A protein has these predicted regions:
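Conserved donor NDP-sugar-binding/catalytic core segment of glycosyltransferases
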Residues: 76, 80-118
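Conserved catalytic-core segment of nucleotide-activated headgroup transferases in glycan assembly
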Residues: 231, 525-537, 669-753, 827, ...
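Catalytic binding pocket for nucleotide-activated donors in carbohydrate/polymer assembly enzymes
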Residues: 659, 753-758, 787-859
C-alpha cells in the first residue's frame, strides 16, 4: 500500500489493516473514493498491542489535514462521510475550538451488546456536548472520530500501555478539552472489536489487560486527575465503571477466560478496590444513568461492597411513599424497579406451585416477602437452588430463591396472586416478571394467558389474575392476542400470529396424540437421545416419537437410510410437535434454544407448551454443574444417571431435585452401543475450554462460529504440539498403532488451525463422524476432563489423562475425585504423557487392574439394557403423571 497525500487536504485518515485482504481492500477503496480533501495514510501496526500506539504516533506526524481520523479494515464508511462531517463541524462549531467530533457508531459484527458505547440514545440532533454537563456522550476509541490534528499531536499515545494506549490518549485530551461534537445523524460502522465486545476482543486473553492495566493506566490517571482538579470529573468516573464492567462481563459465569489464577484474582480485586475508592457512590450506582454503565442492581451493589471492602454490606430500606433502598445518604434502588422473577409455575393437586427468585439486595432480617391469594397470606419457603453470579470463577452475588404452594379455590370466580414486601410496618406490592422459558406467562402481549385445569391465568399489572376457564373467555383472549400481533409492524410478530393460529387449528388433532420429542445436538445425532429413540420407536405403546435433526447434517441421511424419518428442524411440523409434546427427551440442556426459541421469542408462546423434560445426559453429572443442570434450568422432571456418584452429586440442595423423585439410576442410553472392536488406535479426545471457543452468537442448536483468537490459546499450543510430537508418532509406527485426534463439537470449527502430518488424523466431531465407532475401534484414550472418558471406562479400556499445567481448567470436582477415582494415570506435561503412551503401546494397551476396580465401583450397570430400564420408567411416568391431565390442556 502506498501513501496518498493531497495538497490542502482537510482530513488525514490513518488506515489500520485488519489482516483480511478482502476487507482491507474494500475499506481502502472506499476511503480513496471519499474525495480529494482526504489524505489516506496506511499504517502497519504489527501484532503486539503496543505496536498500534507506535504506528499511530508515526503516522500522525505525516498527517497534513486539519483533522485526523482512524479507520480500520472492514469498517463501513458512508459515501461522502468526511465531507458531510466537515460541513456539520463548520455549521456547529463556528469559531469555537471543539477538538473532538464523533458520529453515531455501530459495531458491525453480531454482538450480545446492543447499547452504543457512550452515546446518549435520546440525542438525535447534532450538538456540541460539554463533558462538565453531560457524561453520557464522548468517544473512548478512535474509529470514525475526527480529532483536531494540532490538538492530537499534543497527546501522543504511550505505547507501554498496550491495550489502553488509545483510551489513555483520548481521556487525557478530554480532561483538558471538555467539548465534544456529537453527530448522530451520521453513522459509522466499525469492525475493530472494543473491550465490551467480550466475544471478539483479543485483550481478554492477555494478563496485561487486568492487573497491569489497573496499576499502570487507570490508577495513575485517577491520581493525576485528583491532584489536578481536586476531584475526579464525572465522565472519568463513568469511564471507570465501564472499564470495570468490560472485564467483569468478559469473565462472568461461563465466560471466564481463566487468565487469572486464584492468587491473581485476589490481587485484581485489591487493585479494583483502590480504583473504586476514587469514585463517588453516585457514579458507582450509575445515578447519572449512563446506558453503557448500567448493570443489574446486584452488580452495582457488589462494586459498592468492593469499594468499602465490606462484603456483608446490604442496602437499607428507606420508607417514604414508596420503598427505597440505599446506602448512607445515597438512594440506589426503588421498590418500583424490583421484580419477583417467576421461574416456573405449575398446577398440581389443586395448588399453584411457584418457583421464583428476587435480587438479594437487602437482608431478609429487615424485610418480609410473602404472597397473597386475594387477602390470604402465604409465606415463601427459601431454598439453596443455584442462583450465583460468578466473576473470574469466584461467587460475587446471588438471588434469594424460593418455592411457594398456593391452594386455588374451585368456587371462586377470580383469584388475584400478588407478591408483597413488608418493611417498617409498611406493605408494598411487587410486580412479577417472566424471564424464564417456563414461567407460563409473559408481559409481551396484553391478552396473553395460560389455561390449565379449570382455570385461566394472565398478567394484570402488579399481580397475576386467575379465573374459572370458560371456552368463550379463552377464545376472547386468544383473538385479542391475534389482534395485537396483527396490528404490529414486526414481521416476527406476524410469524408468531400464524404460529398461534396454526396451533389452535391443529390442536383438536394433536391433543389425541401422545408425543415424545427426542434431540441431541440438532446438527449431529448419535448421542443418548438417538439411542433411546431407536429403542422406543420399536415399542408398541401408542406414543408418537420424533427425533429432531437439521437436514444439512450427515446423520440426517444416515437415519433416512436406516429407515427412520427425522423431524426437520424449523419445519412447520417441528413447531407443532414442540408445542404439543408430552415429553422432550434431551441429552443437552436449554430445551427452548435448541428448538429455535430465544427468550424473547418464547415469550409469545409461553402459555402453550406443557411438556415434561427428560434428561438422558451427554456427559456424567459428577462435577459441580449446578449452573447448567439444576432442576429449573430446563424444568427437568426425570434425570437418568449411570452411577450412584451422580445421584449423590445431584442430590445437593443447590440442584433442587430433593423431593421431586426425578433422579433415576438406570444407566445411560448410548452405552448400549459400546462393543469392543479394537483396531489398534490411540484416541485423543479432550473436552473444550471456555476460553478457547466462541460464545454462542446464534443458538445452542447450531455449531459455534470459528474463533480467530484460538491459536493464541494454550489449549491449541499444547495439543498441536502433542499430535505432531516425533516421539509419539515414532512409537505408534513401531508398535503398529494409528492416532486419531477427535475435536470436541464446540472446538470442531478450529480443525484447520492444527498442523497436520501424515500419521495423525484430525477429526472434527461433526459431519458423519461417529463417537460410538471411535470408542469401539480405539485401544486407548487420552482425555482431560471430557465425559467421553466414562464411555471408554464402561468398556474397561485404558485411559490416560492430560491435566496440563499450561491449560486453565474449568472442571470443578463434585463427587468424582480424579486423585482417587480416575480410570487411568494423570499426566501434567506432554513429555510425561508420551512416556506413558509409549509404555502402553509396547504392552498392548491393557487396562490396569487398579483402574478396572475403580470402573466397577463407579458404574451401577455393565450390561446393554440401559434403554430398556429408562423406557420403562418413562412409560410409567407418562401413564401416571401426564395422561390423567392431558385433556385439560
Amino acid at each position: 500500500m502506498g501513501k496518498t497525500q493531497q495538497s490542502g487536504c482537510a482530513v488525514s485518515v490513518l488506515f489500520f489493516p485488519s489482516g483480511d485482504e478482502e476487507q482491507d481492500r474494500r475499506t481502502l477503496g472506499g476511503l480513496h473514493r471519499q474525495g480529494r480533501e482526504i489524505q489516506v495514510i496506511p499504517v502497519e501496526p504489527g501484532e503486539d498491542p503496543s505496536g498500534r500506539a507506535k504506528a499511530y504516533n508515526r503516522a500522525l506526524k505525516q498527517a497534513a489535514g486539519r483533522f485526523v481520523s482512524v479507520a480500520g479494515g472492514g469498517d463501513r464508511i458512508p459515501s461522502g462521510y468526511y465531507r458531510r462531517m466537515l460541513k456539520k463541524i463548520h455549521k456547529l462549531a463556528g469559531s469555537r475550538p471543539v477538538p473532538v467530533w464523533m458520529p453515531h457508531r455501530q459495531f458491525l459484527s453480531f454482538s450480545l451488546l446492543q447499547t452504543p458505547i457512550f452515546e446518549e440514545k435520546s440525542c438525535r440532533r447534532d450538538t456540541i456536548v460539554s463533558l462538565d454537563l453531560n457524561c453520557r456522550t464522548w468517544p473512548v476509541f478512535l474509529s470514525g472520530v475526527l480529532l483536531d490534528t494540532a490538538t492530537a499531536r499534543r497527546y501522543p499515545m504511550t505505547s507501554a500501555l498496550g491495550w489502553e494506549a488509545e483510551k489513555d490518549m483520548l481521556l487525557r485530551l478530554l480532561l483538558d478539552n471538555r467539548l465534544v461534537g456529537f453527530v448522530p445523524t451520521l453513522t459509522y460502522g466499525y469492525a475493530q472489536p472494543q473491550d465490551i465486545h467480550f466475544d471478539w476482543f483479543a485483550g481478554m486473553f492477555d494478563p496485561d489487560w487486568y492487573i497491569p492495566s489497573v496499576r499502570n493506566f487507570l490508577l495513575p490517571l485517577l491520581k493525576e486527575s485528583q491532584s489536578r482538579f481536586g476531584e475526579i470529573p464525572l465522565f472519568l468516573q463513568c469511564f471507570c465503571i465501564y472499564y470495570i464492567r468490560c472485564r467483569l462481563e468478559a469473565n462472568s459465569n461461563n465466560r471466564n477466560k481463566h487468565v487469572l489464577d486464584d492468587g491473581q484474582v485476589l490481587a485484581y480485586r485489591d487493585a479494583l478496590h483502590e480504583a473504586l475508592a476514587f469514585l463517588s457512590d453516585a457514579a458507582i450506582l450509575n445515578l447519572p444513568d449512563v446506558a453503557i454503565c448500567q448493570s443489574a442492581p446486584n452488580v452495582h451493589q457488589m462494586l459498592m461492597q468492593l469499594k468499602r471492602n465490606d462484603w456483608s454490606m446490604m442496602y437499607q430500606p428507606y420508607l417514604f411513599k414508596t420503598l427505597l433502598l440505599g446506602t448512607g445518604e445515597t438512594v440506589a434502588y426503588s421498590k418500583d424497579s424490583m421484580r419477583v422473577r417467576m421461574e416456573f409455575i405449575d398446577y398440581r393437586d389443586g395448588k399453584w406451585e411457584i418457583d421464583g427468585s428476587v435480587p438479594a439486595l437487602f437482608s431478609l432480617d429487615d424485610v418480609r416477602l410473602y404472597v397473597c391469594r386475594n387477602d390470604e397470606e402465604f409465606d415463601l419457603t427459601y431454598n439453596q437452588r443455584y442462583s450465583l453470579t460468578k466473576y473470574f470463577g469466584v461467587s460475587a452475588f446471588k438471588r434469594y430463591t424460593f418455592h411457594v404452594s398456593i391452594p386455588l379455590l374451585e368456587d371462586e370466580v377470580q383469584q388475584d396472586i400478588q407478591f408483597r414486601l413488608q418493611a417498617g410496618g409498611m406493605t408494598y406490592p411487587l410486580s412479577p416478571e417472566y424471564s424464564s422459558h417456563f414461567s407460563r406467562l409473559s408481559g409481551k402481549l396484553r391478552f396473553q394467558y395460560w389455561r390449565f385445569g379449570r382455570f385461566i391465568a394472565y398478567h394484570a399489572g402488579n399481580r397475576i389474575t386467575i379465573r374459572r376457564s370458560r371456552w368463550w373467555y379463552t377464545a376472547y383472549r386468544e383473538i385479542r392476542s391475534w389482534g395485537e400481533l396483527l396490528c404490529s409492524r414486526s414481521m416476527l410478530e406476524k410469524r408468531v400470529l400464524l404460529l398461534r393460529m396454526l396451533y389452535f387449528i391443529t390442536r383438536p388433532w394433536y391433543r389425541r396424540r401422545r408425543i415424545w420429542l427426542f434431540y441431541d445436538k440438532i446438527y449431529k445425532g448419535g448421542d443418548s437421545s438417538e439411542y433411546l429413540f431407536r429403542y422406543a420407536k420399536k415399542q408398541t405403546d401408542g406414543i408418537h416419537k420424533y427425533y429432531l435433526l437439521d437436514p444439512s447434517c450427515p446423520d440426517w441421511k444416515r437415519m433416512k437410510r436406516e429407515g427412520y424419518h427425522p423431524l426437520r428442524r424449523h419445519s412447520i411440523r417441528h413447531r407443532m410437535i414442540f408445542l404439543n409434546a408430552d415429553m422432550v427427551i434431551a441429552s443437552n440442556s436449554t430445551v427452548f434454544p435448541f428448538n429455535g426459541y430465544s427468550m424473547g421469542l418464547s415469550a409469545y408462546i409461553r402459555g402453550i407448551p406443557d411438556f415434561h423434560v427428560v434428561c438422558v445426559q451427554h456427559g456424567m453429572s459428577v462435577q459441580k454443574i449446578a449452573v447448567a443442570q439444576n432442576r429449573l434450568r430446563d424444568n427437568t422432571r426425570l434425570y437418568f444417571c449411570a452411577s450412584r456418584y451422580e445421584i449423590e452429586n445431584l442430590s445437593h440442595p443447590v440442584y433442587d431435585y430433593q423431593g421431586y423423585d426425578a433422579l433415576k439410576l438406570t444407566g445411560v442410553p448410548r452405552y448400549d452401543g459400546l462393543v469392543n472392536e479394537d483396531k489398534k488406535q490411540i484416541l485423543i479426545s479432550p473436552t473444550w475450554r471456555m476460553q478457547a471457543a466462541r460464545l454462542v452468537t446464534k443458538s445452542e442448536s447450531v455449531q459455534r462460529d470459528y474463533n480467530p483468537l484460538f491459536k493464541q490459546t494454550s489449549y491449541f499450543k499444547v495439543y498441536n504440539s502433542l499430535i505432531n510430537d516425533e516421539r509419539l508418532i515414532a512409537a505408534a509406527k513401531k508398535y503398529g498403532y494409528t492416532i486419531a485426534y477427535v475435536l470436541h463439537p464446540i472446538i470442531s470449527p478450529q480443525a484447520e488451525d492444527f498442523d497436520t502430518n501424515e500419521y495423525v488424523r484430525i477429526i472434527p466431531s461433526t459431519g458423519d463422524m461417529s463417537y460410538e465407532q471411535m470408542f469401539r475401534e480405539s485401544s486407548l484414550m487420552v482425555t482431560d476432563f471430557s465425559g467421553v472418558q466414562f464411555d471408554f471406562a464402561y468398556m474397561r479400556k485404558p485411559l490416560v489423562y492430560l491435566h496440563h499445567h499450561d491449560i486453565p481448567q474449568h472442571y470443578e470436582e463434585g463427587t468424582f475425585h480424579y486423585d482417587t477415582m480416575a480410570f487411568g494415570e494423570i499426566c501434567h506435561t506432554n513429555d510425561e504423557l508420551i512416556d506413558l503412551l509409549c509404555g502402553y503401546m509396547r504392552d498392548g494397551c491393557r487396562m490396569k487392574e487398579e483402574y478396572r476396580r475403580r470402573a466397577d465401583d463407579f458404574f451401577a450397570f455393565r450390561d446393554r439394557n440401559n434403554c430398556q430400564r429408562i423406557y420403562d420408567i418413562m412409560l410409567d411416568y407418562q401413564k401416571e403423571k401426564i395422561d390423567p391431565v392431558r385433556h385439560h390442556r
